[in-house]
Amino acid sequence: MNELETVIDALRAHKSILNASGVLHVAVFGSTARKEQSADSDIDVLLDLDETQKINVFDYVALKEQIREILGGGCVDVVTRQGLKKTLKDRVEKESINAF
């Protein structure tokens, strides 16, 4: 199993926990999605959050830590689709691989 499959499987295995935290959809992008990761690469994760749930900054930090732990404790960069800059959004969405 390659790194991308491992990451996708881990996120899918924790779908119910992430859903309970207000996550509707999760995707992987960046070098992991392109299968170009190296030992120094982080794992880039894109989230769609349930806007009906009020997620404050503390909840978001806890969610990022939860995802980091799910993915083995390494370097993980978590962004929301809503928080993406317009200049990055098209590229990120194009290369994203959906977990759920």
Where in this protein do the model-derived segments appear?
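Catalytic core of pol beta-like nucleotidyltransferases
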Residues: 1-25, 33-39, 52-100
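Conserved histidines in hydrophobic membrane contexts and catalytic metal-binding motifs
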Residues: 28
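Short hydrophobic/aromatic beta-strand micro-patches
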Residues: 46-48
